[in-house]
């Protein structure tokens, strides 16, 4: 996506990035602030959600960079 990128396509890309980024921010914040209070299963679930969102972000970025 160079300098002449379609503004609508750019808006769509930003929108697609926002959801997985929000997941990463939210669950990592929970782990930092309350990780010691959580059950191990909850910590594992949150870490899994973060990993899945990171993979989704990577896929979107790889798609946009082709």
Role assignments for model-derived ranges:
Residues 11-16:
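Conserved phosphoacceptor histidine of two-component systems
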Residues 52-57:
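Short alpha-helical segment of the dimerization/phosphotransfer core of two-component systems
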Residues 6, 39-43:
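Residue-level recognition of alpha-helical structural elements
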Residues 58-66:
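Short alpha-helical N-box/ATP-lid segment at the N-terminus of the HATPase_c
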Residues 23, 27-40:
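Conserved C-terminal segment of the DHp
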